[in-house]
Design a protein with these regions (language model features):
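Ribonuclease/tRNase effector modules and their secretory precursors
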Residues: 1-103
């Protein structure tokens, strides 16, 4: 398991995560809960893909988005995309940009 995935899981398990408005809308439209996303990330054995952010709103020159596809505890495949963020001395938190059922 990668160091990045371990850091993401620790942030999630510590409650250090947030959802963008887009991710919240996707959750609602797919009938998912925040717990479904948390379970999916905790169950993940690998990061599916890491990409560089193309957003003009990014705060750093290099910002990476981590895509995780894994099942929740009921076996439902969930797709999430997010980034690790360092703020105010808190180790990290994971900001979810996209969260929905995997196709």
């Amino acid at each position: 398991m990668s160091d990045t995935l371990v850091r993401i899981k620790r942030a999630i398990l510590s409650g250090h995560y947030a959802f963008s408005e887009k991710a919240s809308l996707e959750l609602e439209s797919d009938g998912l809960t925040e717990l479904d996303i948390v379970e999916s990330i905790v169950n993940a054995v690998a990061i599916y893909k890491t990409i560089r952010s193309q957003s003009p709103y990014r705060k750093q020159v290099r910002e990476y988005l981590h895509i995780i596809q894994s099942t929740n505890l009921e076996g439902l495949m969930v797709y999430s995309k997010g980034k690790l963020v360092q703020e105010a001395g808190i180790e990290t938190y994971y900001f979810l940009i996209s969260s929905k059922k995997a196709v």
